[in-house]
């Protein structure tokens, strides 16, 4: 009660600060965001605080500060996002999602993306399934229409495409209602994603050499899958086929580029292949714990492996594509985590280990990190499989005691004497 006697008057005073008190109002936005949890317990005080933050968003545009540009969203945007997450049900009941029209293209993109994520959480907290579907579609429609128009335009700028993908991602990542509300019905994000699938495919073809666009596109895929979880299954086959085809085409273009460089002709640009491999890892994360999905995922890993092996044929190739090396071996490690039996009993494991032995000769921190991580996971999975089967462990593993902290070398001299 004593806190209430201080917090409520402080918030009321903050909301009445004059517009020209810029520094005080910015700190007021921080105060409101800090007490989002308190506001949830006192819903009658939410509306004036929200109105204050909306005014602050518009003021930041009209009266930019002389300070160095913030790398993240403004204080008002972060506070408003915090309120959306903490007070989602209350704001959903007040139809707060309508404020989208006030902020789109009227505030800096970072602020807009932050608030869109919050609005996604508000939509997910709606009382009925129909309201969640309607709200998700309302939030996604403007960037979806803009992205479709850009996909058909010959003069589309990659940055403009990336911005629309960012907006869609912001909506999809938080618009996930509870399983009780879904009750077996289609996930609202999946419906939006499925309707946009032809547009996504067109963008991936049209902008295949743009690292910015492909990375943003795959990030959108990732958050759609994470939001839908198991509800993404109807799109899984199309997703894996698309990722594999994009990876194969990119590898073919990269190999053609290497050949053209050798014969002195012009180098052809290729897509950021690691983004497609990372998305395949997300497929494993979301569906690798279901036994019936293992054959499908193993087929995906096999296809990804063949494509990567076609490009990574020497230490020089490993050094040229360190991001692909890192993501590929993390993909293989993740499959071992979820489905060890399929890979340990497959000839594919030998090919991966052979590729890893080549990668160990590359002096690149990120690439080596992925290769070494896989080697460690593979060893651990193999030992665990042997223990479960009851077969004897190799002498090197059964006789030596595990290394202790005290056994670690403490100086270069210790290493030289070892």
Residue ranges with predicted function:
Residues 1-418:
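Karyopherin-beta/Importin-beta family HEAT-repeat alpha-solenoid scaffold
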């Amino acid at each position: 009660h004593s806190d209430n006697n201080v917090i409520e008057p402080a918030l009321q005073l903050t909301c009445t600060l004059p517009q020209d008190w810029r520094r005080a109002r910015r700190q007021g936005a921080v105060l409101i965001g800090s007490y989002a949890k308190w506001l949830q317990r006192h819903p009658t005080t939410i509306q004036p605080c929200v109105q204050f933050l909306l005014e602050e968003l518009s003021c930041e545009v009209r009266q930019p500060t002389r300070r160095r540009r913030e790398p993240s969203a403004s204080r008002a945007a972060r506070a408003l996002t915090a309120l959306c997450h903490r007070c989602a049900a209350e704001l959903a009941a007040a139809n707060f999602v309508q404020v989208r029209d006030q902020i789109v293209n009227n505030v800096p993109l970072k602020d807009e993306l932050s608030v869109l994520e919050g609005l996604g959480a508000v939509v997910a907290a709606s009382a009925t399934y129909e309201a969640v579907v309607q709200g998700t579609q309302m939030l996604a429609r403007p960037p979806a229409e803009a992205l479709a128009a850009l996909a058909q335009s010959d003069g589309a700028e990659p940055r403009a495409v990336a911005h629309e993908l960012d907006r869609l991602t912001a909506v999809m990542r938080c618009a996930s209602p509870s399983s009780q509300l879904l009750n077996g019905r289609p996930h609202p994000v999946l419906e939006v994603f499925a309707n946009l699938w032809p547009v996504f495919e067109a963008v991936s073809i049209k902008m295949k050499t743009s690292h910015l666009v492909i990375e943003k596109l795959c990030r959108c895929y990732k958050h759609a899958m994470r939001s839908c979880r198991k509800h993404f299954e109807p799109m899984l086959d199309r997703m894996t086929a698309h990722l594999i085809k994009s990876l194969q085409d990119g590898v073919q273009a990269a190999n053609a580029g290497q050949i053209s460089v050798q014969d002195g002709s012009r180098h052809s640009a290729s897509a950021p292949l690691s983004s497609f491999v990372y998305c395949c890892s997300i497929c494993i994360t979301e569906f690798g714990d279901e036994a019936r999905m293992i054959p499908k995922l193993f087929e995906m890993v096999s296809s990804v492996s063949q494509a990567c092996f076609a490009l990574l044929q020497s230490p020089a190739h490993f050094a040229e594509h360190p991001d692909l090396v890192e993501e590929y071996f993390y993909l293989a490690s993740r499959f071992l985590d979820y489905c060890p039996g399929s890979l340990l009993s497959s000839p594919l494991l030998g090919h991966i280990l052979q590729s890893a032995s080549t990668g160990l000769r590359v002096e690149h921190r990120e690439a080596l990190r992925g290769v070494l991580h896989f080697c460690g996971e593979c060893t651990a999975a193999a030992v665990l499989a042997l223990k479960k089967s009851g077969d004897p462990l190799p002498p090197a593993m059964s006789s030596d005691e595990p290394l202790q902290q005290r056994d670690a070398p403490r100086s270069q001299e210790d290493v030289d004497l070892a």
